């Protein structure tokens, strides 16, 4: 079973995310790409639509998209962040995310997932796992934007305001933001990002190709019973990350 190195664990602890190259085997990648082709053919985006377009699918019946997590090293790599805890797919859901050019958008800020209008409790989770399904090796080609280190800033925010502030802010906590980064990579690369890492959709105007990615919301088993505590302690569910950071400071 593959696991993150101590350096990668520390990078996740400080930046809130890691990018790992060539994780998904070619056969699994091809099968998932064909399934996305089928989705787009059966349920095409509206004519002349640009920007983001999502498909939300159940993971309960398996299939080539779910297999990107269950049948590849992605599962064990995510697991290694929270060891000895157990990782699972949250909400039994996988997201196919397209970003269709020409989309002249430039992200003005971040958000956190999980806010649901009218719901008192947010749909939080432990981490986001993204599988890049297309070339995203230049900026402004539909890349995901992230704000490094904001998992820590958000935890400090919720310590002060209380975990209910996630709902009160409607998923847009007002925190001081560093300079953003765009996620770069190619098919088969993966992103593992802390739930509280600020992120957003970017533009797709430097490329003529549709950006494709598949996302899983992952949670440590039992997360739904401790989500409030997790918002106030960014390492509560990340035992392996906490241990790696502690070793660095000795």
Question: Where are the language model's segments positioned?
Answer:
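Short, structured patches in soluble enzyme cores that scaffold and shape functional sites
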Residues: 112-114, 131-135, 146-148
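Non-heme Fe(II)-dependent double-stranded beta-helix
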Residues: 1-14, 21-119
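Short, solvent-exposed loop/turn segments at secondary-structure junctions
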Residues: 25-26, 96, 136-138, 151-152, ...
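Non-heme Fe(II)/2-oxoglutarate
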Residues: 42, 50, 190-192, 196-250
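Short edge-strand/loop segments of extracellular domains
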Residues: 99, 147-153, 211, 217-222
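Short, surface-exposed loop/helix-turn segments at secondary-structure junctions
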Residues: 106-114, 163-177, 208-210, 229-232
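Double-stranded beta-helix
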Residues: 137-198
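Short, conserved beta-strand element in jelly-roll/cupin
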Residues: 118-139, 184-187, 217-220
